[in-house]
């Protein structure tokens, strides 16, 4: 009898413990994936109703010059994470860059937003708590190990192969790890696509710092990583440590800022659109991002900061220490009159100073106000818009993000310009992968716009008549 009572007491304790455990779990903050499971059904229904009620509504017109002009300004894509206003600049889920700098969680003692928190925001439209952000940092760290064949592929790449080519190759090789590809091959229902796309995206983001760092250390140093991923560190801090800059607290802050503000810029730019386009064919996140990285590698897209630095070095040499506004203005006019352009100024959409430029300028004013290259960039900023506006070089004579980021990296000793686009690529993954997950969750179809030949366009415009 005593034994029975003892058993009952033990059983009650066990039940109480289980009950408390369940209660604790039930009241714990939801994970990112759990929040998506809660959010997506309502979002999908909203889109379904929108198409039902307004599916035949005209949302814009297309001019012939747009068809021949890179499709600029054509309303034809859905991109949930960010919207680019020509005057205000980018808004992430309705929030400006100053907003996210203020609202998003930060590292202990840090002042810059964490890219993990932005990833959460872009996916859900919500600002995560510090605990949720920390959990995401830990998940990225836990899933960071590279498959052996990817490590060997990077290590065997010749050092003269451009870092972006190596980056794309390594990301493509991660296709072997794709849960989405495996699930699709087994016939998983399309309502489950987003879950496997989510898992692949987390896995991919987790592995990018190690891939980027191995490429950097192989091409420019001794091939050895100076650190390992630390589960106690945030994403930007781990990336900085792997590159060899982990002891510099300011550089850690720069990586957090850099990864956040370079992440997303609407869906029409080459890297974002390419990732979305390839993903619309139900290619995995690994193949889709690799395609986007190849677009980012193009000199008209992700190479701007490298070209700006090359131009600044030449300008510095020619000015020979005279960084006066008068000397800079003369050089700019000589450049324009010679048929060349001033890199780092102008944008396809923006008509004011890029707020991403402003964020980097404020960082420089705080951390490197006396740095020679920053002083030069700062003086150019005060002179160039007036010169470019007077000349008519661009509809937007204001600086873009590419005119400043390279200077910040140079200051801290990351001077290898050909690697800069790899950092851009790591950052851009934080913007394009959330949309890929949402594409699958909302059941977005394969992209297939209509094309015409020039002869067909001639026939078409003649039938319509001139304006």
UniProtKB/Swiss-Prot annotation:
<dbReference type="InterPro" id="IPR016143">
    <property type="entry name" value="Citrate_synth-like_sm_a-sub"/>
</dbReference>
<comment type="pathway">
    <text>Carbohydrate metabolism; tricarboxylic acid cycle; isocitrate from oxaloacetate: step 1/2.</text>
</comment>
<dbReference type="InterPro" id="IPR019810">
    <property type="entry name" value="Citrate_synthase_AS"/>
</dbReference>
<keyword id="KW-0808">Transferase</keyword>
<dbReference type="GO" id="GO:0006101">
    <property type="term" value="P:citrate metabolic process"/>
</dbReference>
<dbReference type="InterPro" id="IPR036969">
    <property type="entry name" value="Citrate_synthase_sf"/>
</dbReference>
<feature type="active site">
    <location>
        <position position="301"/>
    </location>
</feature>
<protein>
    <recommendedName>
        <fullName>Citrate synthase, mitochondrial</fullName>
        <ecNumber>2.3.3.16</ecNumber>
    </recommendedName>
</protein>
<dbReference type="InterPro" id="IPR010109">
    <property type="entry name" value="Citrate_synthase_euk"/>
</dbReference>
<keyword id="KW-0496">Mitochondrion</keyword>
<keyword id="KW-0816">Tricarboxylic acid cycle</keyword>
<keyword id="KW-0809">Transit peptide</keyword>
<dbReference type="GO" id="GO:0005975">
    <property type="term" value="P:carbohydrate metabolic process"/>
</dbReference>
<comment type="similarity">
    <text>Belongs to the citrate synthase family.</text>
</comment>
<dbReference type="InterPro" id="IPR016142">
    <property type="entry name" value="Citrate_synth-like_lrg_a-sub"/>
</dbReference>
<dbReference type="GO" id="GO:0005759">
    <property type="term" value="C:mitochondrial matrix"/>
</dbReference>
<feature type="active site">
    <location>
        <position position="347"/>
    </location>
</feature>
<dbReference type="GO" id="GO:0006099">
    <property type="term" value="P:tricarboxylic acid cycle"/>
</dbReference>
<dbReference type="GO" id="GO:0004108">
    <property type="term" value="F:citrate (Si)-synthase activity"/>
</dbReference>
<dbReference type="InterPro" id="IPR002020">
    <property type="entry name" value="Citrate_synthase"/>
</dbReference>
<dbReference type="Pfam" id="PF00285">
    <property type="entry name" value="Citrate_synt"/>
</dbReference>
């Amino acid at each position: 009898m005593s034994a029975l009572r003892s058993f009952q007491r033990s059983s009650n304790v066990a039940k109480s413990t289980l009950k408390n455990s369940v209660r604790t779990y039930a009241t714990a903050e939801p994970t990112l994936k759990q929040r998506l499971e809660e959010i997506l059904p309502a979002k999908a229904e909203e889109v379904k109703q929108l198409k039902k009620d307004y599916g035949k509504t005209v949302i814009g017109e297309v001019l012939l010059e747009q068809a021949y002009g890179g499709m600029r300004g054509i309303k034809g894509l859905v991109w949930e994470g960010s919207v680019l206003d020509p005057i205000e600049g980018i808004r992430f889920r309705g929030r400006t860059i100053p907003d996210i700098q203020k609202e998003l969680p930060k590292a202990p003692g840090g002042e810059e937003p964490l890219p993990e928190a932005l990833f959460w925001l872009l996916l859900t439209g919500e600002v995560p708590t510090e605990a949720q952000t920390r959990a995401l940092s830990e998940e990225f760290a836990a899933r960071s190990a590279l498959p052996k064949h990817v490590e060997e592929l990077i290590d065997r790449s010749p050092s003269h192969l451009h870092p972006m080519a190596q980056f794309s190759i390594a990301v493509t090789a991660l296709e072997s790890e794709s849960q989405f590809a495996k699930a699709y091959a087994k016939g998983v229902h399309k309502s489950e696509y987003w879950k496997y796309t989510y898992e692949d995206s987390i896995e991919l983001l987790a592995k990018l710092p190690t891939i980027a760092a191995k490429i950097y250390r192989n091409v420019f140093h001794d091939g050895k990583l100076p650190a390992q991923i630390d589960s106690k560190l945030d994403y930007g801090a781990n990336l900085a440590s792997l590159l060899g800059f982990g002891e510099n607290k300011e550089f850690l802050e720069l990586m957090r800022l850099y990864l956040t503000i370079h992440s997303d810029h609407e869906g029409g730019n080459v890297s974002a659109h390419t990732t979305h386009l390839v993903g619309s064919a139900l290619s995995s996140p690994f193949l889709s991002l690799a395609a986007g990285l190849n677009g980012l590698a193009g000199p008209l897209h992700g190479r701007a900061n490298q070209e700006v630095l090359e131009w600044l070095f030449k300008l510095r040499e020619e000015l020979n220490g005279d960084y006066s506004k008068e000397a800079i203005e003369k050089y700019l006019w000589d450049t324009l009159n010679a048929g060349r352009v001033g890199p780092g100024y102008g944008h396809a959409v923006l008509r004011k100073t890029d707020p991403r430029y402003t964020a980097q300028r404020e960082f420089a004013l705080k951390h490197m106000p006396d740095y020679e290259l920053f002083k030069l960039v700062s003086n150019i900023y005060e002179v160039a818009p007036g010169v470019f506006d007077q000349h008519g070089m661009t509809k937007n004579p204001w600086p873009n993000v590419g005119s400043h980021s390279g200077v910040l990296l140079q200051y801290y000793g990351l001077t290898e310009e050909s690697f800069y686009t790899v950092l851009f690529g790591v950052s851009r993954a934080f913007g394009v992968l959330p949309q890929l997950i949402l594409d699958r969750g909302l059941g977005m179809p394969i992209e297939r716009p209509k094309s015409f030949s020039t002869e067909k366009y001639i026939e078409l415009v003649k039938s319509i008549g001139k304006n």
